[in-house]
Amino acid sequence: GGTSVLDTFRSYVYHSDVSGSAEAGLEVQARDSKKSEYVNDPVYSGSAGGFGGALLNGSVKDSKVTNLRKVNGMNYTGGFIGHLGKSGTVDLDNLGALGDLLSAGAGVMDVFGSHVDRCSVEGVNEGFTVHSNNTIDQKNKSEIAGGFTGYADLGRLSENKVTGLKQVTSGQIAGGFAGKTTFAYLANINLDSELVKGLVTVVNQILKALWLDELQKGQVIKIDLGIIEIDALYDGKLVSLNLLGLDIKVGLAEDKSLATIYIGDSKIEINCSESGTIDEESLKNEINISLIKANRTKIDKCTVTGIADGYDVYGGGAGNNANGTGQYGIAGGFVGWNNEGLLENNNMFFADVIRGAKDLTGPFTGKSSLNSNWEFNDVKGIEGNE
């Protein structure tokens, strides 16, 4: 039917291994570089990684690289994957009747990042190095290097590990685990949009069923939004569903007075009326804020561990005896440039020298950007659980 256009065509790689030889180890090198422009958001090829060069809107889980010695790239370079990129999933111009519902959610549907969970990189005994240096084009370049990934563009990374890291170097941005993170606020969503109305309808229908104790564990609920019908699953505590690519979970407290709603990474708690429903205006406001915050790089429960002598991170062309230079000479022990990414419960061990340009170097992040007018945002909120 018409809802088939909502299917996300992703590349999936599960339970896969890449292993270098016991003696020489694995070496990977990118030899070319090109720039592509996407509405003032350039993307560069020349990516390199021990497992993959670039992953656009894909998922890799439970996979590993062992005996890695060296990864050299022109631009985005990482020990595991150089470029964790985003891509569009739906052409809104060809949706017909669904266009009205999706138009306000264009930011939700157009932008999906890649997911990497429970993956690992392990170096040879003497450690592995990651190096980003564009030798082809010194003007059109984006040199970003990280021990696990170079450029995590809206990527979601959870429970990944780097061990045996020796050095990360870059002509521009360098980080022990990731080079750069990004965000994409969905600020154009209107409170009266069909997307928000749809979410309000979904949440209230689920809460009413929970309030009336009508649901059994494992039961599938069908919610009709007119244009599309959505299936939701009850696991005994929460009702889970996916609306237009948004993961949503809804629960009700035992005394039925408080509803808890999860939209992506955001958690909403709001009081219920005696009939089990929530005031629509209050819910609209809460949902709108959650949607605005929905799209950002998230790195959670990840670890980078250096060799016994410690790992070095050099940004901006820095070296053993020189500091980095330039406005992008950024170096951080865990992330080079955290551009409003969400970093939670991460660890770094055996970091030695972190060196970049003046005021762009730090033990955890080299630079943290937070240019936001939203009162719910602060640096502690996005890097608070280090």
Identify the function of each model-found stretch.
Residues 1-386:
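Surface-exposed loop/turn motifs in large extracellular/passenger domains
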